Regions:
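An acidic/histidine-cluster motif and surrounding catalytic segment
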Residues: 1-138, 146-199
Length: 199
């Protein structure tokens, strides 16, 4: 079993325990989705950054909760560090540019992509749907993983199917791994980043 999971917290508005988020994501990948091979990046961003991504890549105004970039069938070439430093201004061959140098490969293997999440939107949506922002954040990770698995939410029937699967996985996750501790404060130095390589 091998996989690479990188998590970057580029926002400070909401304190997120990135170690717990890593654990939750690994439970989803390995135990609930039975993924043995994966290269996944999760990037937590603030609303202004998510708004720019949403407008640039989806053509929608304002922020959104989660955007998924699937690198599995694109065959991107390795990008240099200059592209990583460029952030949102990076060449569009790798859409978000957050972790492009780490994740882009000539020969994609297994589940391969990047999930960008706006934590402030999780807080806002949690209030609207009367749930915790931690559960909403876990739902966004699940949503992104399902997109990487091939689920589509553009049409009504497909959207309902995806929502059902999100709910099922969220319930199963809650039984296996506590979600609420995502709110716990953890010491951070500079840009919080946790990488995991399992084999």
């Amino acid at each position: 079993m091998s996989g690479t999971l990188s998590i970057r917290n580029r926002q400070r508005a909401i304190p997120v325990d990135v170690r717990r988020l890593r654990r939750i994501t690994l439970v989803l990948l390995r135990d609930l989705l039975a993924k043995e091979t994966f290269e996944l990046g999760i990037c937590l961003v603030r609303q202004p950054e998510m708004t720019r991504l949403n407008e640039t890549f989806l053509g929608h105004n304002g922020p959104t909760d989660v955007i998924t970039f699937d690198y599995s069938d694109a065959g991107y070439e390795e990008l240099g560090r200059a592209d990583l430093r460029a952030g949102l201004d990076a060449p569009q061959r790798v859409p978000a540019g957050f972790m492009a140098g780490e994740l882009a490969r000539k020969e994609p293997r297994g589940l391969h992509g990047e999930i960008v999440i706006c934590v402030q939107e999780a807080v806002s949506q949690a209030r609207r749907f009367r749930t915790s922002w931690q559960r909403e954040l876990a739902r966004y990770v699940i949503h992104g993983l399902l997109h990487l698995e091939g689920y589509d939410d553009r049409r009504g029937a497909d959207r309902r199917k995806m929502k059902r699967e999100e709910g099922r996985l969220l319930r199963r996750l809650g039984r296996r791994c506590p979600i609420e501790p995502l709110a716990r404060r953890v010491p951070s130095v500079g840009n919080s980043s946790i990488a995991h390589r399992g084999s």
